[in-house]
């Protein structure tokens, strides 16, 4: 099959549009959508902008870092940094840490690591061992988010960029709708408003399907860790992943439609967030909408 935009051989079919793309035009398509998201999510009016990338060493965060570097490498008013969170999962995080550090060295981007054991004096493996009835993701998620906020503040970042692709984002929207969780829906990144004590999170890959992320990484020689978290099988997200995959097979473009829906209700959600107040956890002092943050209340 030939590329829809040139005479080159196609490497990818965008089923939602029916377009066939060669490697060069796939890269251009991905980068154009990333630029669009950056323009929409980052305020450049203030002058110098500092963006820190939360990089796990997997495909999504590695592509996020690489693409932002390509976009801003000649810009004097944007500085990039990166950090990795080590949850303490034996046999899983080591290869990701190595890939993250290697990519940062290759791109000349400063990189740091912060761990659960440093901040919480425990590891994810210990939490699961001591609490076998707990869904691991329900504990890991809040702890990771807290460390993202702490490390991005340490790096004096205006924004923290997350490697969340279109599939991830649409799954999260479905989960929140299914649970009727309006508050969590309102707190979803990208964050357009600054809240005291919180670094705004941006999602450069929000319009990039997972398959395109993988191909972009391969086409650009980006090494990434493809291993799965050993606790992945117990995640509630798996059900919504399967639902979305079925919907995409039957109606290509469903994920883009879910994204459009989320953006459509964003103004109303932003108004509800504006009216909310941000407290400091009475135990650890980190920002929370409650008296005690989720991390402390679960420990």
List the predicted regions and their residue ranges.
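ATP-dependent adenylation/nucleotidyltransferase module used to activate substrates
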Residues: 2-187, 195-198, 207-220, 293
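Flexible helical/loop "lid" subdomain adjacent to adenine-nucleotide binding pockets
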Residues: 31, 167-171, 177-205, 210, ...
């Amino acid at each position: 099959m030939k590329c829809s935009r040139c005479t080159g051989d196609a490497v990818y079919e965008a089923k939602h549009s029916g377009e066939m793309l060669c490697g060069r035009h796939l890269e251009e398509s991905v980068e154009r959508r990333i630029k669009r998201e950056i323009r929409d999510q980052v305020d450049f009016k203030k002058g110098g902008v500092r963006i820190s990338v939360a990089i796990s060493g997997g495909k999504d965060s590695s592509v996020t870092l690489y693409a932002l570097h390509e976009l801003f490498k000649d810009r004097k008013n944007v500085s990039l940094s990166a950090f990795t969170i080590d949850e303490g999962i034996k046999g899983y995080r080591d290869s990701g840490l190595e890939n993250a550090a290697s990519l940062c060295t290759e791109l000349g981007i400063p990189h740091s690591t912060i761990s659960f054991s440093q901040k919480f004096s425990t590891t994810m493996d210990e939490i699961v061992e001591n609490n076998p009835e707990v869904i691991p993701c329900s504990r890991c998620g809040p702890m990771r988010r807290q460390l993202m906020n702490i490390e991005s503040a340490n790096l004096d970042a205006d924004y923290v960029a997350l490697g969340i692709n279109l599939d991830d984002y649409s799954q999260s929207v479905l989960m929140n709708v299914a649970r009727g969780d309006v508050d969590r829906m309102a707190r979803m990144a990208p964050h357009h408003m600054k809240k005291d004590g919180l670094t705004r999170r941006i999602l450069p890959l929000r319009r990039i399907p997972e398959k395109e992320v993988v191909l972009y990484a391969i086409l650009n020689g980006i090494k990434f860790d493809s291993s799965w978290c050993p606790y992945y099988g117990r995640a509630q997200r798996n059900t919504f992943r399967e639902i979305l995959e079925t919907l995409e097979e039957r109606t290509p473009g469903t994920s883009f439609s879910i994204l459009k829906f989320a953006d459509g209700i964003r103004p109303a959600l932003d108004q509800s967030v504006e009216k909310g107040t941000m407290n400091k956890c009475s135990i650890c002092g980190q920002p929370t909408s409650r008296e005690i943050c989720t991390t402390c209340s679960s420990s």
